[in-house]
């Protein structure tokens, strides 16, 4: 299992460890990944992800998984998240069509 966020595709980053004497040595910054189950209200389905805590905070800020996926640019999402986003959009379009038909 690689240490990659399954929603945003974030990977480990690289940098320098700087000592008190300002000596620099190479190091890696690993993600703080957690296994979580997130629920989609629109699809009425649960999804399991390995997600970075930064992504979890963003999901909380946006409101829920659906709002996060719909408000995030597709380029920034992983393949798995892009598939879920496409399914969300299909369901939303279908609901709008049903509303338009029922109003007419």
From Swiss-Prot:
GO cellular component: cytosolic large ribosomal subunit
Molecular-function annotations in GO: structural constituent of ribosome
Matching InterPro entries: Ribosomal_bL28 (IPR026569), Ribosomal_bL28/bL31-like_sf (IPR034704), Ribosomal_bL28_bact-type (IPR001383), Ribosomal_bL28_sf (IPR037147)
Top-rank taxon, per record: Bacteria
GO BP field: translation
Pfam families, per the entry: Ribosomal_L28
Alphabetical UniProt keywords: Ribonucleoprotein, Ribosomal protein
HAMAP family: Ribosomal_bL28
Family the entry assigns: Belongs to the bacterial ribosomal protein bL28 family.
Protein name (database record): Large ribosomal subunit protein bL28
Gene this protein is translated from: rpmB
């Amino acid at each position: 299992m690689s240490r990659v966020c399954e929603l945003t595709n974030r990977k480990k980053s690289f940098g320098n460890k700087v000592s008190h004497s300002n000596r620099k040595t190479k190091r890696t910054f690993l993600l703080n990944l957690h296994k979580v189950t997130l629920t989609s209200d629109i699809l009425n389905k649960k999804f399991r992800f390995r997600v970075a805590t930064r992504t979890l905070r963003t999901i909380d800020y946006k409101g829920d998984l659906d709002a996060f996926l719909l408000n995030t640019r597709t380029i920034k999402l992983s393949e798995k998240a892009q598939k879920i986003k496409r399914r969300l959009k299909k369901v939303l379009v279908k609901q709008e069509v049903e509303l338009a038909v029922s109003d007419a």
